[in-house]
């Protein structure tokens, strides 16, 4: 994949995903995807209620960089570099709830194409990416990991106000 061809989708526009997507938008065409329509509407109006991204920076990303936020999977289909940044909560027994992560993997599986890359930014225990997430992407997409698409894991190094 050539640098000039990169089109990024960040799945999950929370305290990790939104700052990351905003920063990516300064260099690459970037789409932020979230399941929460009210959150997407607020972001597209230039306001981040969580205050992770300064409203001025968000408005600049939208107006000058073409950054968009959406709940529409058709708008992320043309992307070729997917970053999954969804929460990984724990239950009362401190067991991780992979539901959001597996849902995001299904979303990626519905839109990923040959040659694309998916990077997992969510905090998970060792083995989750290859043993839990990528099989979902393979099953939904019909593509094969490391043959048709590629993946990585980025341990989170959160820097607020990017």
Task: Show where each model-derived region lies.
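Redox-cofactor binding/interface segments in oxidoreductases and associated redox assembly factors
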Residues: 82-84, 120
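NAD(P)+-binding Rossmann beta1-loop-alpha1 motif at the extreme N-terminus of oxidoreductases
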Residues: 1-47
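N-terminal glycine-rich dinucleotide-binding loop that anchors FAD/FMN and/or NAD(P) in oxidoreductases
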Residues: 47-67
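Short, intrinsically disordered, charge-balanced linker/junction segments flanking boundaries
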Residues: 160-162
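Short acidic low-complexity segments
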Residues: 1, 63-79
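Conserved beta-strand segments of alpha/beta enzyme cores
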Residues: 29, 66-68, 144, 150
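Rossmann-like NAD(P)(H) cofactor-binding subdomain of soluble oxidoreductases
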Residues: 90-157
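Short conserved AdoMet
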Residues: 25, 77, 112-113
């Amino acid at each position: 994949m050539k640098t000039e061809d990169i089109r990024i989708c960040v799945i999950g526009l929370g305290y990790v995903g939104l700052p990351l997507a905003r920063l990516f938008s300064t260099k690459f065409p970037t789409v932020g995807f979230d399941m929460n329509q009210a959150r997407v509407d607020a972001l597209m109006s230039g306001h981040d209620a969580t205050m992770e991204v300064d409203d001025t920076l968000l408005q600049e990303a939208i107006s000058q960089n073409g950054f968009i936020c959406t709940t529409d999977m058709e708008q992320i289909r043309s992307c070729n570099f997917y970053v999954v940044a969804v929460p990984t909560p724990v239950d009362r027994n401190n067991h991780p709830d992979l539901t959001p992560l597996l849902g995001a993997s299904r979303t990626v599986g519905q839109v990923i194409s040959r040659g694309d890359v998916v990077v997992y930014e969510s905090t998970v225990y060792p083995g989750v990416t290859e043993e839990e997430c990528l099989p979902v992407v393979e099953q939904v997409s019909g593509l094969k990991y490391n043959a048709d698409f590629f993946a990585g894991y980025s341990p989170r190094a959160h820097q607020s106000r990017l």
